[in-house]
């Protein structure tokens, strides 16, 4: 049996929402900290951060931890922000895209 991607465990469409939400949350926090992409990447590349912020790439846990540290927060705080955003997006009365 092949390796399963964690995003394959999500309902159809939610993997894109998770990538997009995580990228948006990271970008929001980076801008709030008044950091450029170059200042926020640590050992990562600016191209990688751009891909993550645009929702095209799901960061690994290690990359998420590095980015969180660069932003002066923790990975769980970032994920909490994404969870809140996703829950409000999928809540009754909110029109899903």
Regions found by a protein language model. Name each.
Residues 31-51:
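Short alpha-helical DNA-recognition segment
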Residues 2-8, 16, 79-97:
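Short, charged recognition helix plus adjacent turn
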Residues 38, 67, 97:
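Localized chelating/binding microdomains
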Residues 26, 37, 46, 61-64:
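Helix-turn-helix DNA-binding elements, focusing on the entry/boundary residues of the two helices
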Residues 2-32:
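A short, Lys/Arg-rich alpha-helix, primarily the initiator
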Residues 54:
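Short, conserved catalytic or interaction motifs in soluble domains
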Residues 2, 60-78:
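DNA major-groove recognition helix of helix-turn-helix/homeodomain DNA-binding modules
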């Amino acid at each position: 049996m092949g390796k399963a991607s964690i995003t394959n465990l999500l309902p159809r469409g939610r993997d894109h929402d998770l990538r997009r939400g995580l990228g948006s949350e990271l970008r929001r926090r980076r801008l709030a900290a008044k950091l450029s992409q170059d200042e926020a990447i640590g050992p990562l590349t600016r191209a990688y951060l751009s891909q993550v912020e645009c929702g095209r790439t799901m960061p690994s846990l290690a990359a998420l931890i590095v980015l969180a540290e660069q932003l002066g927060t923790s990975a769980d705080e970032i994920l909490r922000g994404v969870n809140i955003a996703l829950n409000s997006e999928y809540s009754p009365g909110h029109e899903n895209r």
